[in-house]
Amino acid sequence: MNFRTQVELPKEETEIRHSDRIMLFGSCFAENIGNLLLANKFRCDVNPFGILYNPLSVAEAIRQTLSYKTYNEADLFCDRAGWHSFMHHGSFSGNSAEECLLRINERLGRAAAELPQTDWLMITWGTAWVYSLKENGKVVGNCHKQPDKLFTRRLRSEERRVGKECQIWC
């Protein structure tokens, strides 16, 4: 007796090899897949900005990586918990601006050097909801538990999501 449905998939012409370079951007799914690939000795760069869920944050992270952006103190904000970037996961936060900037710029520099040599780029989007700062309209990748009154929340339509993200490659 068979207790599961078996699905036969055709073999792909192109397969990921251990010698390939892989970069992943996006949600916790990208993080988990990337960590599994690393555990199995694949050459991966996983989420250079940390986990990002919405398509616009992922697109902006890729744009910043391609342009070799360097962060400075004006790109950060400070609260009682330390220094943070709205574009980065909390793992990049620091007790000082210098500590936070060192983590961000070191990681971004590695990703910027790696991206042009990448054979596979994997992108996962976790939500169509986008948060932006009310004060300047900039999309954020992480709210860092800041008050919701600082942000505007909006739902991206399918056409707008695909159109905006496709601009990454133009």
Predicted ranges, named:
Residues 159-170:
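Single conserved hydrophobic/aromatic residue that forms the stacking wall/gate
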Residues 67-111:
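A basic- and aromatic-enriched beta-loop-alpha substructure that forms the phosphate/nucleotide-
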Residues 93-98, 102, 142-161:
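Surface-exposed cleft-lining segments at the edges of enzyme active sites
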Residues 21, 120-122:
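Structural motif
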Residues 124-150:
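A short mid-domain helix/strand-loop element embedded in enzyme catalytic domains
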Residues 116-117:
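Alpha-helix C-terminal capping/helix-to-coil transition sites in glycosyltransferase folds
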Residues 31-34, 86, 129-133:
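Short catalytic/ligand-binding loop motif for oxyanion handling, primarily in non-cytosolic enzymes
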Residues 1-72:
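Serine-esterase "nucleophile elbow" of acetyl-processing enzymes
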